């Protein structure tokens, strides 16, 4: 999509003024890339930033969903517990069970997501430990995430998770190390920019955009780019780009209609022309 967009912009370069930046968002699936893009400073002088994500439409047609939201702030992290191995039958008292520490931490984290201010989520998606059935496990690793409908809620749930990890490690005499693997903030698109994009869709594609509210229910680190531009006085917007889809998200049979790539590039190029086109 980004290559097609760049080529389209190059072909209409004489009609543009100012500076148009085409930014690749790396490691989006793990919400690991956008923050580093923001820290580079490339967005500090940007007046408008647009991003999108493919989504499924009910009839499989190409569509633009402009009224998007529900981006959950999130933290992704790995935890390694270290204990001490010993013989499970002959000298279990000499061991420090890292598997039990990780299991207790998992149970504790999963029960601390309630928040009256909004939505909270926690998931431990992977737990590995041990070397054999007759060995007290000396090491355990879990991969987890916390989420919240606002950055504040997400931060509190993450803090509760860290408390659970620390307490579980102490209970079983283990040490632990937390490695942050990614994250995203919550954000809101600017209404004025959304209206511009909707008119571009009508004028350039000859179709009516889907303006019904669509909440993501997941996380998207493009929100860091949105916030960076907004904090510098600019406008930001994220949209869903509808197409047909096979298999559910994160399913091994997942696939999508690739015609959405050209469709999306036309939208982005048309928006750039509307926002940065020459007026004389």
For every predicted segment, state its role:
Residues 1-5, 9-126, 131-137:
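Histidine/acidic-residue-rich, glycine-tolerant segments that coordinate divalent metal ions
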Residues 99-280:
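Metal-dependent amide/peptide-bond hydrolase catalytic core
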